[in-house]
């Protein structure tokens, strides 16, 4: 088991480092703790980061810019310092991607094996990226789709190539966790990518194209791959009312799990056929399918006076 976090002197205190530990799991407790990666950290923000295992069991993690400005942030000067990158830590390898401002989400497509991430912009340009090997996400020069002028401003980190996001929000939503469904329990959504956000408490669903390297939109407002400030997002909003979502995970049981930081709760999304009629005695709340008033299947449940709705 791998554990990646920013270790500090105390809760909210000075960071000591972004650290990766491995443990053995015997089914009851974690044992044999080993520090395998100790990354530089002096700031309390933009440290990272998600961790993911690909189809070959390689392990990756993402690190934010940590307030640094150097070559890995697309400046012409400054020594690389393991910030604004996706690292492969097992087996060790040079930077998989650079130019990342701040990310809370990594996911591997279970069909294609391709890596995807979410990235938070400053006050614009939140995005979803298809992260190919030697990817340059563009920060601090580019956030959101690039203009020709911005492309010319990239100094160019040898061997790394910039690609536009697969989707961008003009207004910040703080996208976080993302996950694919590969389960017969959600057959309708096998070709979908689910993304959560922290600012609005929304769960988004993006329909993948046949090549699984981009999205299909029916709305003319979203077909330019940008959600402008006044564009309707009804097509992609799958669920609402989750507070600050920090992670979206497809579990080994084939169900979808939503982690809400603000609610202190893990929500499990289940199809009606496996639904339960009451909440289990834990922080996990199970959503039950019910027929909507207009004949559309939806999930509706209430927790802490906030209504949650999911379109199915």
PLM regions: where:
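Asp-box/WD-like beta-propeller blade repeats and closely related beta-sheet repeat scaffolds
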Residues: 14-53
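Short, exposed beta-strand-loop hairpins at the edges of beta-sheets
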Residues: 12-13, 256-260
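Juxtamembrane/start-of-transmembrane alpha-helix segments at the extracytoplasmic/lumenal side
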Residues: 275-290
